[in-house]
Amino acid sequence: VSDRVRRLMRAREKMTLESENRLQDFLAALQASPNGVVLLDSQGRIEWFNQIAASHFGLDAQRDLLQHFGNLVRDPGFVNYFASHDFLSELLMSGRQSTPSHPVKLSVHLHPYGQGRLLLLSRDVTALEQAEAMRRDFVANVSHEIRTPLTVLAGFVETLQTLPLADQ
């Protein structure tokens, strides 16, 4: 009987160790993600986050674990997004490191899972926003530059149409 109990205990320890290793592999994969990842419990408290999320939101593992995420991110748009429980779309908000001279834009999306838990994904879209602004400016400038010569040509054609032309 004692041999059987020992074998069962060893098998259980082996399964526990394998589960722990799988969990560590999973957390390492989340840590390597290019996106910020935050796991929230059913009350919105932080259970885990990766380094990217720490830099996006100014989080500290010693200080902020089990704190309510909405209390740490004081962006009114995010507070409304979080309270609405309508997570079909993402939210654009300023990052923690944003300054007037160096704005940082984050795309934040909450995904419900499990028993009321939330997965928060964030990504820095600053470069994307800047590229879109440059594209808009370029299109506006090009359309203005094209419109000006076309206006001159249209005026020239109108002038030619009003002049009496000889049959020569």
Task: Annotate each language-model stretch with its function.
Residues S2-N21, D25, R123-T126, Q130:
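Amphipathic coiled-coil signaling helices used for dimeric signal transmission
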Residues L65-A127:
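PAS-family sensory/regulatory modules and their coupling/dimerization elements
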Residues A140-H144:
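Conserved phosphoacceptor histidine of two-component systems
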Residues I146-Q161:
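Short post-phosphohistidine helix in the DHp/HisKA domain of histidine kinases
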